[in-house]
């Protein structure tokens, strides 16, 4: 299986409006005579490549530490889409994924600038997929 790195560079990717930009600060530097290098790093949890756990949108949803890591590793179906993903779009994406490769259909990546509608989110959540991701 070929593995694709779709992670975004933290300091080069777009920051969600209203969120603080990531920052890094050199605390210790061997170049300045210290015995080691040390850097402090801060960022909003929604910057760069990240996971939105169910808790992000569901009051009693699971937090990131409670998620099963196996859901994040494996074959995935990539569906290119731009704009709002509707109920019908979600249904069609799931059907096409299952037709093309049932194993890959367990993890669906939406490629493009998308917004998942509430109706589409419910379809994805009620299906048997393990992961829904967005890669711009």
Spans of features found by a protein language model:
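Active-/binding-site microenvironments in catalytic and ligand-binding cores
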Residues: 1-136
